[in-house]
């Protein structure tokens, strides 16, 4: 059951920082304030400059406060899946009260018993998701409080991450003047918010196409099956445009947003002017030519994702592929993705008034996830916070939950390094361009032989 109140989500991205304030009332989430500020001090989704990132966060929070008309004291901040480890665990305690009635304290204690795992000093528990409680052998219990029993067991999934990344995240947010209410694993929030009940049950994949990285999350049977990070995103498309057309990064971003088409068959032959470095006059370029540059990078990203999904037999899930994120807004993105994946692909657009934009799907999911946390979830989080204040102690670890043994959590979810690739200058689309502007500098001549193949490694 959803909690009522105000929930603030904080999405710290490579290109922008988004803050969203939502009020949950009568089971409905209503957005009352949202902001989008330029990001600083963040690279590939990871904070690399605490002061710069804190300044950007503070600016975004101030904007959101002004629009929402409230003072923001704490936030629910998203954590990317970089170097995430997930593993099943279980705990068991005796119920020691005289009445044998299970209380909040018993729930906290059984969670703590599940956390008694030997962990290296460089890792920290992010969250613990209880899957079921068992009271005196009776399974499938969601909330055991108020029940009577002599033995309480619990099974769930334990999520851990690099201590340094978590420390930097909390310190940055606190330096911006607010407290961290919850650290929420972004892939978990995304699949819960973006997908419907049927998609989460039968299986679907969400692809968040950001500026600095692309995040993949697959869910099936209501459980997160796979997460993957590619250190390539919309910024790499902009870099390719800048390099091939020999124009500034700022102008290249404008060309992408104003004339970009991800699927070349849909691109027009219309021309536009480009200021080229080293040229006195602007050069005419066709939208079709620009589309070839854009699609080459995006296709490269999607093909890497397809390989990962194919390896794990997760490509042909009934729910297909769902695209979100700022880079997913490009026209033709769905068509290109369908061509690459060969399955149903759709673009998710939030239905909240005023922010019907896939770029806000992530920050919305953070507020929604926080609002959906049950009292049992909050008790588990409280137990984790208490344990994280203590030094990790090498204590024997309980039995593993077998039903999720095939999940990739047994190994770290490593971010795939961005390959050193070079953009290719398209040649075929230039034929029409040359006919339309015979007196203009010939881009095909300038770039012919620049690079043989965009993705030769």
Swiss-Prot record:
**Which cellular components does GO assign to this protein?**
cell division site; cytoplasmic side of plasma membrane
Q: Which SUPFAM superfamilies match?
A: Actin-like ATPase domain
The reply on keyword Membrane is yes
Q: What induces it?
A: Protein level is negatively regulated by KhpA/KhpB partly at the post-transcriptional level via its 5'-UTR (at protein level).
Main subcellular location of this protein, as a coarse class:
membrane
Pfam families annotated for this entry?
A: FtsA, FtsA_C, SHS2_FTSA
Compartment(s) of residence = Cell membrane
User: Per the record's keyword annotation, is ATP-binding included, yes or no?
Assistant: no
Q: What keywords are assigned to this protein?
A: Cell cycle, Cell division, Cell membrane, Membrane
GO biological process entries? FtsZ-dependent cytokinesis
Q: How does it sit in the membrane?
A: Peripheral membrane protein
**Which family, according to the similarity comment?**
Belongs to the FtsA/MreB family.
State the protein's purpose: Cell division protein that is involved in the assembly of the Z ring. May serve as a membrane anchor for the Z ring. Increased expression restores growth to a PBP2b (penA) deletion strain as well as mreCD and rodA deletions, but not gpsB or rodZ deletions. Does not restore wild-type cell morphology to the penA deletion.
Q: How does it assemble?
A: Self-interacts. Interacts with FtsZ.
Q: Which NCBIfam families match?
A: ftsA
Q: What is this protein called?
A: Cell division protein FtsA
Q: Which organism is it from?
A: Streptococcus pneumoniae serotype 2 (strain D39 / NCTC 7466)
Q: Which gene encodes it?
A: ftsA
